[in-house]
Amino acid sequence: MITSRDVARLAGVSQPTVSRALRGDQRVSEATRERVQRAADALNYVPSETGRSLSTRVTKRIGVVVTDLTNPFYPHLIGPLHDELEQHGYRMMLFTERSETAVASQRLLDRSIDGVVLATATIGSRLPDDLQRRELPFVFLNREAGGRPADAAVVDNELGGRLVARELAELGHRDIAHIGGPAETTTGREREMGFRLGLSEAGIGLPEESVRRGPFDFDTGYRGLTEILAGPTRPTAVFCGNDVIAIGAFNAARAHGVRIPEDLTLIGFDDIPMAAWEAFGLSTVHYDLGELAQEAARLLVRRIESDDDPEPRRTLFTPELVLRATHAAR
């Protein structure tokens, strides 16, 4: 059976472009409509009435997949994302299931929305493939799914990890630990990779016994530092995979009588507003959270409203180190 996917492949466009072209959508250029029609004629393709009725439905709604709203990081993305989408005439719907499988199974993740923002993707995730099969435009925000060419607004996580490693080396630290995020996330993996590479360039090792990993949450930081402090060698510095982990580690240090920064340097990643609170004064890796979210919205709107099928665009934000009160020289 010939499908719109076959027509798209022959015409060199996306499936959504095929649907728009065959219904005479004026957002598609005349040249592209003619190319799609020639491909459809060559394959004797006739769109089904069901498919046509679905493809012509414009809802002006965008689904946003965020699996953990208890993480203080995500509310600081949601506000700017909402505002940018609203400026383009779209309303936002939140999907907050704990697993991507649950999200993918929901009826809402179909043509009842015009596109999807994936803010919690994991490496090897099947959700992007599900969206492609359903011909739903999507964009990665903050995390990617590993190797898939797709629109994305992300941070140069590897560079951020390198910046932390260089700073710690310049401060004279040699016994260093890392409490990172999940290895199945690009954010967790890339930040640790950059950190390891930066330490290696300075001639410093990072033994596996000095590394802990877990969800990007408070408990990972608290538990991770507690375990590291119980080990044979106490570190003088710890790099945490995000600020929430770092705040957990900060509290664990206080509970165990470890002074920050006198006894232990602590550096996070993301620079959420909480990091700047006087209670923490967390040194961390900074990038513009609001602009990251707004760029993801712009990329998705571009994908939805484009005349033709544009090449995937990956916007990479450059981070910088913000030094506050949780770092010191050895």
Task: Describe the predicted segments one by one.
Residues 61-166, 170:
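Alpha-helical recognition/docking segments in bacterial nutrient-uptake
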